[in-house]
């Protein structure tokens, strides 16, 4: 068993960023600045990358697939597919950065689940081997007032382990 690095296509994100770059409204300017922030999970020698590398190289996680997906995702991917209620406060413009009515800056790395579970190789592995496992780490965005303990961008790791009961019972 070997870890796979699965990179989800970012073409849609690139198109949305091109459209965003044409805008000059305050909301667009704020989002453009946030998108310029480095994802410290990918920056060599950053304390965040060092810590996350230690996590993903723990014996328990050494074979987990690593999922990299766009920073801009659809409302469906960020909320609907994770069963976030339509009236949940996290959907409000006061809590989430909306690019347009259908796209947001990702608010959590859990969003990777829908991308991962749609991958044909992943589904084949689940069928043949009885389990799948993945981690996703990266920068996420939430509207927070900046103070000593809050910033609108931070780094997060999320994991997923799914198995057939015949393979393992998780307690």
Stretches with model-predicted labels:
Residues 2-171:
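TRNA-recognition modules of translation machinery and tRNA-sensing kinases, especially anticodon-binding
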């Amino acid at each position: 068993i070997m870890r796979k690095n699965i990179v989800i296509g970012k073409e849609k994100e690139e198109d949305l960023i091109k459209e965003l770059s044409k805008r000059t409204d305050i909301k667009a300017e704020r989002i453009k600045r946030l998108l310029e922030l480095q994802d410290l999970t990918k920056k060599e020698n950053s304390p965040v990358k060092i810590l996350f590398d230690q996590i993903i190289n723990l014996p328990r996680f050494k074979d987990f697939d690593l999922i990299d997906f766009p920073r801009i995702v659809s409302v469906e991917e960020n909320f609907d597919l994770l069963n976030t209620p339509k009236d949940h406060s996290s959907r409000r413009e006061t809590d989430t950065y909306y690019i347009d009515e259908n796209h947001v800056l990702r608010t959590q790395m859990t969003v990777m689940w829908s991308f991962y579970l749609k991958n044909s190789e992943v589904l084949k592995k689940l069928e043949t081997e009885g389990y799948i496992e993945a981690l996703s780490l990266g920068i996420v965005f939430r509207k927070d007032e900046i103070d000593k303990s809050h910033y609108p961008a931070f780094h997060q790791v999320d994991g997923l382990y799914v198995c057939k009961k015949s393979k393992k019972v998780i307690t």
